[in-house]
């Protein structure tokens, strides 16, 4: 099937385990049905011929045969489970390897929690379709054919009854199997509910503070209602067929007793009928299990299809709009040039025909309202996205001409939301430069103003962040991030609102760290706190993806400019105080 072709592509070296699982499962089915044939011969000796001594040897053979069938099924399951676990591992590895090479755009658009959930949960969803369904589907196909053959060996009546059961059971089974499109919608609603639940839990502080109920979170509430509806509809669609299915198989013997007793004419015929009833009881149970396996097979195939399609869509998205790198490793200089650059997010234009130059060694601030394009400019310089039109150059060469390693080494990015790993403070800084010595790392920590942070902990730079109650404030995290950037020693520094939410206690230390980081570098700073950019060489004011003003703080403040009005609004907001006076 198509699903297995997709899945086995990720376990080429272990594909033989699937073949072995099918072979052992088929042998198990043959042994199991042959075991029931021996049971029939045993009952024939015992009931019809009353030959107890002959029945004993057959009984022993049937026990050995059925036990052998169970062992072969266990071995089949062992093969398929090894294959299933290897598949899950490889799907997760494929995701992790893809993350290492993914475009910056991918990380910009996809939260880390969502990525982890998609990879982990969908890899786990493939387990049933491989580990359980490979042996079960083999038995579900082979066993009914063998059971029907055995039924006709017992008697024409038994064969006809089992054939009728097979036909009716197959029709009922078809009614119980969900349509592929419906199952896809059901899976999507379940994924949506899981994602919204995570967001709801993350916002639990807000929920408690404002005593908000679940209806207040519209997307979460809608996800609950949608999933509830689809789960209820699916249950209702299966209710009648499933009840009829169980009634058909489990009530069959009771249904047959009355006509059998009515047509029974002698003790001999009673013995034959009793034997047939017992065999119908046994063989209908085997058919019931086979049909149930087919039903689960349909459901797990739908789950597996959805899981692998979701994962492959994620893998594809990782490479989407990825900057194709060249092989240039050296920069002539670090001047940055935009030439008629246009860029759009999902067909929504953000920057159109933008051109400007930034000189090496100077510091620049990008200011403007939300959506003006300043963050997009910074991300385009870093190679987060491919431009739709035009080109971006560093040192007179398009950034796409540089190798990946050269571009990463040349540019450091300091984000507003600092990310630190659950490792020591030292390791969090040292990862910026694998060749750095301990003296280099400690110097970077000192220049970033981290001495006061280290003094708080007995183990200083060896303190593990996030363990034993060790947690850092936003400003402290930012200083460690700056130490990392100092150690990397890139020639271009991009700071995306790096001081936007820093508390006053940390601001002074942070500003000193910024000065050490920015020394002799080309700096692009995106700032909302306009007080932090007055000393920069040049301020670039953006609006609707265009540069509307450019100059030093002194130049722009001396004229009637948009920048001047932004500074006045910023200063006015800072002067505002909450008073105890009643506002009339």
Map each language-model feature to its residues.
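Conserved "ABC signature" C-loop
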Residues: 11, 415-467, 489-494, 505, ...
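An intracellular "coupling" helix at the cytosolic face of ABC transporter transmembrane type-1 domains
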Residues: 9-16, 104, 121-130, 134, ...
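Transmembrane-helix motif of ABC transporter permease domains
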Residues: 16-32, 47-88, 275-282, 289
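Membrane-integrated ABC transporters
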Residues: 1-31, 52-58, 80, 125, ...
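Helix-to-loop junction immediately C-terminal to a conserved catalytic motif
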Residues: 382
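C-terminal portion of ABC ATPase nucleotide-binding domains
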Residues: 512, 529, 534-584
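A hydrophobic transmembrane-helix motif
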Residues: 27-41, 68-71, 135-177, 236-284
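Cytosolic ends of transmembrane helices, especially the final helix of ABC transmembrane type-1 domains
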Residues: 193, 212, 239, 287-316, ...
